[in-house]
Structures are given as C-alpha cells and as structure tokens.
Regions:
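Glycine-rich phosphate/adenylate-binding loop and adjacent beta-alpha elements
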Residues: 68-88
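Active-site phosphate-binding and catalytic loops of NTP-dependent enzymes
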Residues: 44-50
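Ferredoxin-type iron-sulfur electron-transfer modules in oxidoreductases and energy-metabolism complexes
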Residues: 31-43, 87-234
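Short, contiguous acidic and Ser/Thr-rich linear segments
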Residues: 20-31
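Short structural boundary motif marking the start of a folded domain
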Residues: 1-4
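Short strand-turn-strand beta-turns centered on an Asx-Gly dipeptide
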Residues: 25, 64-68
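Short N-terminal binding/cap micro-motifs at the start of the first secondary-structure element
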Residues: 11-16
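Short, structured protein-protein interaction patches enriched in aromatics and acidic/basic residues
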Residues: 53-62
Length: 234
C-alpha cells in the first residue's frame, strides 16, 4: 500500500488547510500520479483536482508532487516516490480554490499582458506570411508551452511579485513573438516590458527549467529579452 498525503481545503467547511492521509493500493504497478489521485477520489468523492487529456498536452493537472512541480498525468510513481511516501500539494504561490485546484487568474493576467498573438500592420498577403526554414527554426523551444504554470509557480520572483513580474511562462511567450519574423511590433513589445519588474526580476535560478514538462528553457528566453532591451536602449 502506498502512503499518500494530500492537501485538503474546502473553504465552505474548513477553517484552515490540512494534509490528509490515504492508503492507496497501486497493485504493485508503476502508475502515474494522476491514477493515484483517481484512486483517492474513489475513497472520497469530495476530493478535487483538475485533469483533462491525461497525455501531458492540456496542462490542466499541474501540481506540486513530493516537493517539485509537475504534471500528474505524466509523472510515474517511480520518478518521485521515496520510502513509499507520496505528498501532493497545489501549485505554490496561487490562491487555492479547493484541495488541489488553484485560482489561475493572475497567471493568465500576466500572460495576457505580453499580447501573445502575431501583430503585423502591413497589408496581409493573399495566402499567408511566409517564413524561411531558418526563421521558423528560431521558434522551436518557444511555441510548445502548454500554460500548465509549473514554471511560474516554482519561481520565487513570481511568488513575491505576481502582479508585477510577468513570470517565466509569460516571458517565454513574449520572446516567442519577439523572435517571430512575421511580427513587426518589436519596438512596442519591448517598450511594454521596459520597467524594473516585468523582466529584470528574474534571478536566473532556473527553477522554471527544472520543472518544465516540455523541456523548455524560459531562463534562456528571458536572457534574450534582456539583451534586446539593452541593445534597444529602452
């Protein structure tokens, strides 16, 4: 039997959060953490968590698993369990709605600030705006983000200033459009990032890199933005 400790909090009935212990029979199999949560829900139907695709694509089930953020659906027990103990908590730094469900509003608000869509005020071509293979290659490692928030909620700078520091996920997407040859709003995008908090509160500790389920490198992208800001003189 696997010993599982999960964070519980129902604001309608709990005065404060608490950790609840469960014994889960995994059948001796190396199942995913999400499967363990489903077995817990069979024991307690009121247990709440987010999940959707079960394939590491939607980003819904980001949570803190034995002290490290990750996606429950693609995290096998063998990768995290030590001493037959599993501890699951909500993503840190965000308000808890119930149990493992967090309020993502500030995360999406910061993402929205970078205007994550192509902007080009030149006349649109009849078919599409073309890119060379080399130009397209510059977007690799940027567009694959699934907005699971594992990176931003592992970042102390985001914990301390969630309303000012944009966070790794938003800044990765900021650079994704700065690097896109089809976008011609570089000057405006950089001007919007020109303040002491939006970009420069990153301390390059690379927590974001260590937890990204897609193997992306927000710290590197933030470094590129810093360089562009310095070179532009803004």
């Amino acid at each position: 039997m696997l010993q599982v400790s999960v964070y519980r909090y129902n604001p309608d009935q709990d005065a404060a959060p608490f950790m609840q212990e469960f014994q889960v029979d995994t059948g001796g199999k190396d199942i995913m953490v999400l499967d363990v949560l489903a077995l817990i829900k069979e024991q307690d139907e009121g247990f709440s968590y987010r999940r959707s695709c079960r394939e590491g694509v939607c980003g819904s089930d980001g949570m803190n698993i034995n002290g490290k953020n990750g996606l429950a659906c693609i995290t096998p027990l063998s990768a995290v369990v030590k001493g037959n103990k599993l501890v699951v908590r909500p993503l840190p730094g965000l308000p808890v709605i119930r149990d493992l469900v967090v309020d993502m509003s500030i995360f999406y608000k910061q993402y929205e600030k970078v205007q994550p869509f192509l902007q080009n005020d030149t006349p649109a071509p009849a078919i599409e705006r073309k890119q060379s293979p080399e130009e397209r290659e510059k977007l690799d490692g940027l567009y694959e983000c699934i907005l699971c928030a594992c990176c931003s909620t592992s970042c102390p700078s985001f914990w301390w200033n969630p309303d000012k520091f944009l966070g790794p996920a938003a800044l990765l997407q900021a650079y994704r459009f700065l690097a896109d040859s089809r976008d011609n709003k570089t000057e405006e995008r950089l001007a919007a990032l020109d303040d002491p908090f939006s970009v420069f509160r990153c301390r390059s500790i690379m927590n974001c890199v260590s937890v990204c389920p897609k193997g992306l490198n927000p710290t590197k992208a933030i470094g590129h933005i810093r360089q562009m800001l310095l070179q532009s003189g803004t």
